[in-house]
């Protein structure tokens, strides 16, 4: 039988994941900064896992194993997010301030809002993407959470001009085309990478501020 402590933690995590940011900020204005960070980390972790699972399923279904490595080293695998000075790992992220990491995370999230509106049309028969029509909503929730954290840290007006030089294309619904398959494969790879960065930045900030034992990741 599961102990009361872990069970309570799991229930709290599930509740936070399902709770809209409007409720967090509006109905519970006294919610602690640690609670806002915990909520953001859970949402980013959930989205990153979904992105990773989807990439793996797409790769297994459509991309021959012998071609995967070569494709990942071509232009199709280039991510537009690489045009911004974003840390590439935990050590680099620790050199940035919390507000810098939040601004970068916001840019990464916002770069996907357009393409992900069409995601469910591409993966209508996918088991992993059975909830693909909600990915956009989840991403919007995370965007709101990051903005809430920025407001808490008194950065009311995010810097103008910090935008991606390019943005991501929409996913191609013509899955019978080789070009479309390669395009979608590249987009899913970038989505996975960008969500991994976002999750890493949020976890670095949370651990740095609150020094939790679970900071070794």
Curated annotation (Swiss-Prot):
Q: Does the keyword Metal-binding apply?
A: yes
What residues does Zn(2+) bind to? 46, 199
Metal-binding recorded as keyword: yes
User: Per the annotation, which location comes first and is thus the protein's main one?
Assistant: secreted
- Hey, which family's this protein in? Belongs to the somatotropin/prolactin family.
Please cite one Gene Ontology biological process associated with this protein: insulin secretion
Cellular compartments per GO CC: extracellular space
* Disulfide bond positions: 79-190, 207-215
Instruction: Output this protein's name.
Output: Somatotropin
Where, subcellularly, is it found? Secreted
User: InterPro entries attached here?
Assistant: 4_helix_cytokine-like_core, Somatotropin, Somatotropin/Prolactin, Somatotropin_CS
| Pfam families, per the entry | Hormone_1
In this UniProt entry, the residues modified to Phosphoserine are: 132
Gene Ontology terms, MF aspect = growth factor activity; growth hormone receptor binding; hormone activity; metal ion binding
Role, per record: Plays an important role in growth control. Its major role in stimulating body growth is to stimulate the liver and other tissues to secrete IGF1. It stimulates both the differentiation and proliferation of myoblasts. It also stimulates amino acid uptake and protein synthesis in muscle and other tissues.
Tell me which positions the record assigns to the signal sequence.
1-27
Which UniProt keywords are given for this protein, alphabetically ordered? Answer: Disulfide bond, Hormone, Metal-binding, Phosphoprotein, Secreted, Signal, Zinc
Q: Which PANTHER family match?
A: SOMATOTROPIN, SOMATOTROPIN,PROLACTIN
